[in-house]
């Protein structure tokens, strides 16, 4: 599994596919309203962690980082686990096992 090491921790590279929410604030016809669909999104970067809050799991990722001074992360996302597609859910679980494996 491809990964980077920052601050002594391994962060695996992931590609996550998920469904985003879309909204339209203005007035629209029935036809325009029915045309609203959730777009399929792709996030590429590194898995920071997975956490649970109020019984819901979330995935945190980052795409940019610095190693000078102390570890810091940028281009960060927090995605509800429930909007990930099936393969991305599997990939996150494999990445977590990789992160937790001493090596």
PLM-predicted stretches and their roles:
Residues 2-103:
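Conserved RNA-binding domains used in RNP assembly and mRNA/RNA metabolism
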């Amino acid at each position: 599994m491809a990964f980077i090491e920052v601050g002594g921790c391994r962060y695996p590279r992931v590609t996550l596919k998920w469904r985003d929410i879309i909204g339209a604030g203005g007035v629209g016809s029935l036809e325009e309203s029915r045309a609203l669909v959730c777009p399929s999104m792709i996030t590429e970067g590194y898995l920071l962690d997975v956490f649970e809050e109020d019984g819901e799991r979330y995935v945190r990722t980052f795409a940019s980082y610095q190693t000078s001074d102390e570890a810091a992360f940028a281009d960060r996302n927090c995605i509800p686990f429930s909007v990930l597609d099936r393969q991305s859910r599997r990939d996150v679980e494999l990445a977590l096992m990789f992160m937790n494996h001493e090596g």
